[in-house]
Curated annotation (Swiss-Prot):
A GO term from the CC aspect: cell outer membrane
InterPro entries according to UniProt: Lysozyme-like_dom_sf (IPR023346), MltF (IPR023703), Solute-binding_3/MltF_N (IPR001638), Transglyc_AS (IPR000189), Transglycosylase_SLT_dom_1 (IPR008258)
Database matches in PANTHER family: MEMBRANE-BOUND LYTIC MUREIN TRANSGLYCOSYLASE F
Cited Pfam families: SBP_bac_3, SLT
Protein's name according to its UniProt entry: Membrane-bound lytic murein transglycosylase F
Amino acid sequence: MTRIKLNYFVIGVVALLLALALWPNIPWRNGQEGQLDRIKARGELRVSTISSPLIYSTGKDGPSGFDYELAKRFADYLGVKLVMTPHHNINDLFDTLDSDDADMIAAGLIYNSERLKRARTGPAYYSVSQQLVYRLGSPRPKSFSDLKGQLIVASGSAHMTTLKQLKQTKYPDLNWGSSVDRSGKELLEQVADGKLDYTLGDSVTIALLQRIHPQLAVAFDVTDEEPVTWYFQQSHDDSLYAAMLDFYSEMVEDGSLARLEEKYLGHVGSFDYVDTKTFLSAIDNVLPSFRPLFEKHAGEIDWRLLAAIAYQESHWNPQATSPTGVRGLMMLTRATASGLGVKDRVDPEESIRGGSVYLQRLMQKVPDTIPEDERIWFALAAYNLGYGHMLDARKLTKNQNGNPDSWVDVKMRLPMLSQKRYYPSTTYGYARGHEAYNYVENIRRYQVSLVGYLQEKEKKAAQHAAIEAELGKAYPVVGPGWSINN
């Protein structure tokens, strides 16, 4: 799955021009109270969304997700509190706009012309294609004419519109069902589990789900790349809409939008079934032996990220040894281990402790101008490449008018460290920058798989426990010699 990089300059210019065009329709210019005034008086921006790791989710560290962070920044821009409410059904999202229970929708929704009857859209903040999926191992359809089973999509989704258009123009015999009680993500999971033959999904969601459901396979692209947008009420009052366009222009201009996309989508790349399957098997069979050590020595690092680093380094093999002499779970050099007080590099606890301490030292060493949530990627590049070479990549970025404090800019320069055109002018010389690039991207993918897979296991365990508890209430345990009197 290849994603088209959005032209953020074009987005910013379009947003600015639209904001200027809407200027005459802003009520406060005529002394009237507009939607933006009501939001500020209320002190809340009400946003409808759906629950998804990519879009909006809550955990022990609070809410997260691409749409959540973008909406939170918009609320901060307006000077109000964000109130984000998840809904299960896409139709419910638009009902909240119609009933004025929400000011906008931020739910990773594809642009859909049919929705323009009920709402209007904001600028695109990333793009996806619609794809048909099936379960790996079953016959792969090459077109809709090859479908040999049930096709179901989420009610109210853009996929419904796409299928209607295809039936009218190309596949008159095409049939499908729609589900109001299952989300698009749930339908994708049902295909992966063999409970449903086919469904449609967006390319980004599918790519992320494949990290924890590798048997989910893409049959073919149904559409070209399409924009993902927010939705707003249809209204002659343009006050909120104009503020949103101004906000987008600023996000584009200062690089914040590109950095958010990098944070949530930068690791979405090619899918390796065998590697993913092997990793998930290792989570079940190998990780339990080392998980307590990762949790114990993680420090300021998420233990799951530390575990992902160790898997990239050694595949969780404490006896691992490279031709260059690095050894152990965290593949420490003899010199690094000595400096960290690690006496036995193949001792799992010593190796994990040493690797964690070394990485945290690198994070503290990273320049303060780098944002907090991006420091880890610079530190990981330094962990793999050497701190000096990471600084060279930042210098190259600055010389090429990029932002040396932005990981999305710097990572693109890492491969240049091995190119003769560039490395002679660097301070620390030649380095295998392409390996550091792949190193960090692999770790990010492993972390996504690990977090998602463990969450799925915990969710299923909780559901099983709830069912067992209900069964226990319905059928009380009867001990030997006891009797139940009616």
